[in-house]
Design a protein with these regions (language model features):
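Active-site neighborhood of glycoside hydrolase catalytic domains
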Residues: 208-229, 233-335
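Loop/turn elements at helix/coil->beta-strand transitions in domains of secreted/extracellular proteins
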Residues: 66-68, 100-107, 155-159, 223-229, ...
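Solvent-exposed loop/turn segments at secondary-structure junctions
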Residues: 75-78, 113-116, 166-170, 234-239, ...
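Conserved, mostly hydrophobic/aromatic
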Residues: 70, 103, 160, 230, ...
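Aromatic/acidic polysaccharide-binding cleft in carbohydrate-active enzymes
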Residues: 323-398, 416
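Bacterial Sec-dependent N-terminal signal peptides
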Residues: 1-23
Length: 472
């Protein structure tokens, strides 16, 4: 009889549902307190009587996240040189380390000068060198390449993609790196190019430029850096005084289909070609290229920035199979403010809701007010004071960390709905649900968040970023 009782008791324990309290991990940031671990929140069973501000649907997966990153620029490397070796390593670790930093895994770099180079240069400034006899990355070997290798200490599998701001000036109609005059360049008014194509649309020049870009990829490979993708023109619609180049949609379609694509294939480069980085929101311009079978044979995806945010959702709906990437975060004006961080959250949510698989910040590190070589003060994730050597992690650093730290490459964005809109949800490879929120209000806000058959209630602080982590 006693033995029968024990068997019955064991059977009861095996069939009885397990009851335990599951908690939600909570990290928050305000302007006064950054990256603070709050007390865990209890996850409760959902009821029909409870109203919910947001509902998360873990089984409804959207795009897979390829990663997060920023851009390697010359002035960023110069800012790091202000620090001693130990402090410099700490900064790099806080950007790239997967356990302690932002876990950057997919980053950008320029091909030749951009507006955060020390000054103008290209990789072949010898006029008429169609065979690229004088092509050289010697300057990069002193600045950008060491910068990248230092980062790879903390992220060995770091993926790099690249884009030119301007071709060599001898390939351009006005023989200048810029298309618009300004107080920081020597372009004459009569040489401005304010519409049309700034690149010479001649077969010799187009062929040479395709070789120029392919040699860039090959040269970097020899220095131990694999460039997995090239976006062949930064902002082909921009008008400004720093390095740039105007292209019309038909000209872009032509160079991709007849020159870049065939050249990369002939050289057996595994590097992808992307249509980017696009700063335009007119669908007809996209259609010219994305509806071309000849160009689409070579295009791996579309990169968007600035005005691109206005069309990304429409573009994603129309071209559902085309991969999308956000390629440059909006840069501010060197204020390094909490408001800038809130704008960053807005941009990240906007692009992620539009289907991008990667998000790229602009300057990772800058000195002082973040002044470019062409006179524009801009923000960075990390600010270094040259005089005091003080390192400041800006509000945008923490806004970015609320996304990237718990959402590594391989995570999936998942569906969410409800009246509370300042929210993005992911499922990471560790089986964790990650919910990132922003409270823009000047007062605290209570939120009920439902996850399948459970929910939790939380009151988030005014002007705060919050990340909630639930083990599923």
């Amino acid at each position: 009889m006693k033995r029968q009782f024990k068997i019955c008791a064991l059977y009861f324990l095996l069939i009885r549902p397990a009851t335990f309290t599951q908690n939600v991990r909570w990290i928050r940031s305000t302007e006064q307190e950054r990256w603070v671990s709050n007390n865990p929140i209890e996850l409760k069973n959902a009821t029909a009587a409870t109203s919910y501000d947001a509902e998360i649907y873990p089984t409804q997966k959207q795009q897979t996240i390829d990663g997060w990153g920023g851009c390697f620029n010359e002035l960023g490397w110069d800012a790091l040189q202000v620090l001693d070796a130990k402090d410099r390593e700490t900064v790099l670790k806080t950007l790239f380390d997967p356990k302690e930093g932002l876990n950057f895994t997919i980053c950008r770099m320029p091909i030749g000068a951009n507006d955060y180079a020390r000054n103008w240069y290209s990789l072949d400034d010898s006029a008429g060198d169609f065979k690229m006899k004088y092509f050289s990355i010697d300057r990069d070997r002193k600045i950008l390449i060491p910068y990248i290798h230092e980062a790879k200490k903390y992220q060995p599998a770091l993926k790099l993609w690249a884009s030119p701001w301007s071709p060599p000036v001898w390939m351009k109609t006005n023989k200048h790196y810029a298309n618009k005059r300004g107080d920081h360049n020597d372009l004459k008014p009569e040489n401005e190019v304010l519409s049309g194509n700034q690149f010479i649309q001649d077969e010799n020049y187009l062929s040479a430029y395709a070789v120029y870009l392919s040699k860039f990829v090959e040269a970097y490979q020899k220095d131990g850096i694999n460039v997995y993708a090239v976006h062949f023109q930064n902002e082909p619609y921009t008008l400004n005084q720093w390095p740039n180049c105007l292209w019309t949609p038909s000209a872009m379609c032509n160079i991709i289909a007849r020159y870049l694509g065939p050249t990369f294939r002939k050289e057996q480069l595994k590097t992808e070609l992307w249509l980017g980085t696009w700063n335009n929101d007119v669908m007809a311009n996209f259609d010219t290229i994305l509806s071309s079978p000849e160009a689409m044979k070579y295009i791996a995806g579309v990169g968007l920035q600035w005005e691109g945010k206005n069309i990304i959702q429409e573009l994603h709906k129309k071209y559902t199979t085309v991969k999308l990437m956000q390629t440059e975060s909006e840069c501010g004006n060197g204020d390094f403010s909490w408001k800038d961080a809130e704008h960053l959250f807005f941009l990240m949510k906007k692009y992620l809701d539009g289907g991008v698989t990667a998000y790229t910040y602009w300057n990772m590190v800058l000195a002082d007010k973040g002044t470019s070589s062409w006179g524009w003060n801009q923000n960075a994730l990390i600010q270094i004071d040259k005089a005091s050597r003080k390192v400041t992690y800006t509000p945008e650093y923490y806004a970015f960390k609320h996304f990237s730290y718990f959402v590594p490459a391989g995570s999936s964005k998942i569906e969410s709905a409800g009246s509370f809109k300042e929210l993005v949800a992911f499922l990471n490879p560790h089986g964790e649900l990650v919910i990132v929120t922003n409270n823009l209000q000047d007062t605290a806000k209570a939120i009920n968040i439902k996850i399948s058959a459970q929910y939790f209630t939380v009151t988030v602080q005014p002007k705060s970023f919050n990340t909630f982590i639930v083990k599923l």
